Amino acid sequence: MTNISSMELGCDVVTEKPITTDERKAQRIIDAQKKTGRHIRVAFNYRYAPHHTKIRELIRDGVIGDVFSVHFEWLLNTVHGADYYRRWHRNKANSGGLLVHKATHHFDLVNFWLGTEPDTVFAFGDLNFYGKQNAEKRGVKDFYYRCHGSEAAKGDHFAIDMDNNPTLKAMYLDAEKDSGYIRDRSVFGDDISIEDTMAVLVRYKNNVMMSYSLNSYLPWEGFNVMINGSKGRIEYHAVERPYINAGGDKKNEGATKTYEIKVYPMIGEPYIVPIKKIEGGHGGGDPVMLEDLFHPGAQEDEFHRAADHVDGIKSILTGVAANKSIASGMPIKVGTLVNF
């Protein structure tokens, strides 16, 4: 693992999310960090987006009182969402599935907003839309292995044409002779082992409850978050721009088209919360995070957005526990997965 070998060579580490994909590898990172004393930063850019930071501020300032429950719904559309089923992510042994690879962002946000960590997780998950069997149920008859060179792919809305995208062609198609990696698999193949429909229940250590859903075949991309407390409710709605990963337009990755945070006081009129807009990927979070990563401590951060390996591992453990719950049909105690 690159994180571990870097620390063993005496380096501090900056890593993308997810920090890893299962509890065994997470424990190895914990042990290596203790042994080497090196520092790990996890690049959780969503923490730095102004609208996400605003939620932490509202909760911190007691605007809705003590938080009791959260409902978090994430929607992936058939551009970005479908892309996970073309690539290496379609194999759960590689990616941990979307509950680890994608939802680590969302689970980290909840940990960050509430200042807590998961205690117990229960989940359901199925592959209902993607995959050959599901396509056959809908009457699809023309199947193909990959888009490149396939006549059947030309009429498929879900096919990705790397020949006509210079960035994808150079990065993947032209490199196949060296890498052996095929980037444009059919999303209706018969060897997909990740889910596309997921529902998760989480009890946190501070007794807050969360219901979470993730679906990856929907007409629009974005999320709805509802946070309920002793003095009111926050409703947070966002629509994001769809994109193809590594498709050449970096600024659109996670870029927000529209968003609104609305507070509903228990007594009084609801109101929309003003948010300062910052240009950049992931809702304006990328430039703020990069400044913090490469100039740490230049400015004091009242929201403590910098994430270390402990934050990174706690974010994946919700998804790891959810995967175990889907497989076993039982609730999972998160504290049994690793030792910090």
Residue positions per predicted region:
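A structural signal for well-ordered alpha-helical segments within the folded catalytic domains
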Residues: 1-4, 27, 49, 53, ...
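Beta-strand-loop-alpha-helix segment that lines the small-molecule cofactor/substrate pocket
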Residues: 1-47, 62
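Residue-level signal for alpha-helix termini/capping positions
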Residues: 7-8, 34, 60-63, 115, ...
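Glycine-/small-residue-rich active-site loops that bind phosphorylated ligands and cofactors
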Residues: 20-21, 47, 77, 219, ...
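Predominantly a Rossmann-like dinucleotide-binding segment in NAD(P)-dependent oxidoreductases
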Residues: 46-185, 293, 329
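A short glycine-threonine-serine/GTX helix/turn-capping micro-motif
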Residues: 94-101, 187-188, 276-284
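Contiguous C-terminal substrate-recognition/catalytic subdomains in enzyme active sites
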Residues: 152-211, 216-220, 238-240
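C-terminal helical cap and adjacent loop that interface with cofactors, partners, or active-site loops
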Residues: 194-340
